[in-house]
Curated annotation (Swiss-Prot):
Organism from which the protein derives: Encephalitozoon cuniculi (strain GB-M1) (Microsporidian parasite)
List of residues binding ATP: 19-27, 42
PANTHER family: CELL DIVISION PROTEIN KINASE (PTHR24056), CYCLIN-DEPENDENT KINASE 11A-RELATED (PTHR24056:SF107)
E.C. no: 2.7.11.22
UniProt-annotated location(s): Nucleus
UniProt protein name: Probable cell division protein kinase ECU11_1290
Origin organism lineage: Eukaryota, Fungi, Fungi incertae sedis, Microsporidia, Unikaryonidae
GO MF annotations, alphabetized: ATP binding; cyclin-dependent protein serine/threonine kinase activity; protein serine kinase activity
Reaction equation(s) it catalyzes: L-seryl-[protein] + ATP = O-phospho-L-seryl-[protein] + ADP + H(+); L-threonyl-[protein] + ATP = O-phospho-L-threonyl-[protein] + ADP + H(+)
GO cellular component: nucleus
Described purpose of this protein according to its UniProt entry: May play a role in the control of the eukaryotic cell cycle.
Signal peptide range: none
Length: 315
């Protein structure tokens, strides 16, 4: 940041290549001219940067969170720079090598040791984030970035916000969205992130999304077919306005046990707890770190380094 509150210029950076693109902006690999350090540079999509009140709250929120949260498993922001055009801004961030979505797409099932190690790092980042009173609200493989050494960074905080008593239910990418949000709850906490963790861990183990719905009703149907149909007791004390409109399927068998028993009791129990219908029964990030699934998962397995190396540059 320049004196007087002005941002530094994009001219301080040299573009290397485009890493990825999305509705909220493109991401480039860049090199800073003054010291040759490599960063990721996220261009803020001009059509989505601004609302009727000026600069979009999504971008303000992401910058503020990343500037004040410092943890080895959370993406770090270096600075915000301005482009050559009016209202053209970029976020300069730590540069990672690939993301979990690319890894799963490339190799399919991730080995148990690698899955446990990545889960451990994800929980550490969430423990810190939740301890600061912040919910991510959009955890998914494409927002989990990886380094060549197996290091993990939780990224994309555009939907993150401080925990409040009343929040919008238009959050979390559909496949990773918890059942209470699908059923209309506007009162939730960090437990929504833990459901998403369960979906991500299940995806690492199976090599494909475990709840890939094509719409909200199909998503609920897939949840019921995997986990069974919830009872009134599962949601006692919760305000879920859409639950009364859901028709109980006539006949079906929940497939979770058959789908996950091959991964062992610790893994199956861990994922099943995270996918509890009652959000109050899901383990916290801190409790998850004490579970048998991630116990002794502090050392990066060589297989993960090999996998990330093969996928480097795929984001």
């Amino acid at each position: 940041m320049r004196s007087g509150g002005r941002c530094n210029s994009i001219e301080n950076y040299e573009k290397v290549c485009r890493i990825s693109s999305g509705s909220f902006g493109n991401v480039y690999r860049v090199r800073r001219k003054t010291d040759n350090r490599v960063f990721a540079l996220k261009r803020m999509n001009p059509s989505m940067c601004y609302d009727t009140n000026g600069f979009s709250i999504l971008y303000i929120r992401e910058v503020m969170i990343l500037k004040h949260i410092r943890h080895r498993n959370i993406m770090e922001i270096e600075e915000v720079v301005e482009g050559c055009e009016i209202n053209d801004f970029f976020i300069v961030m730590e540069c990672c090598d690939t993301d979990l979505r690319s890894v799963i797409h490339s190799v399919g099932k991730i080995g148990m040791k690698a899955a446990r190690f990545l889960t451990c790092q994800m929980l550490k980042g969430l423990k810190f984030l939740h301890g600061a009173g912040i919910v991510h609200r959009d955890l998914k493989p494409s927002n989990i970035l990886l380094m060549r050494d197996g290091g993990l960074r939780i990224a994309d905080f555009g939907l993150a916000r401080a925990i409040e008593s009343q929040m919008t239910n238009l959050v979390v990418t559909l496949w990773y969205r918890p059942i209470e949000i699908l059923l209309g709850s506007e009162t939730y906490d960090e437990s929504i992130d833990m459901w998403s963790v369960g979906c991500v861990v299940g995806e690492m183990l199976r090599g494909e999304p475990i709840l890939a719905g094509e719409g909200e009703m199909d998503q609920l149907d897939r949840i019921f077919r995997l986990l069974g149909y919830p009872t009134d007791a599962d949601f006692e004390g919760l305000d879920l306005p859409h639950f009364k409109n859901i028709r109980r399927p006539s006949t079906f068998e929940a497939s979770f046990e058959g789908d996950f028993e091959c991964y062992g009791e610790e893994a199956a129990s861990f994922v099943r707890n995270l996918l509890s219908f009652d959000p109050r029964k899901r383990c916290t990030a801190s409790q998850g770190l004490c579970s048998g699934f991630v116990a002794d998962a502090e050392e990066c397995p060589g297989e993960l380094v090999d996998i990330v190396g093969r996928c480097t540059g795929d984001i």
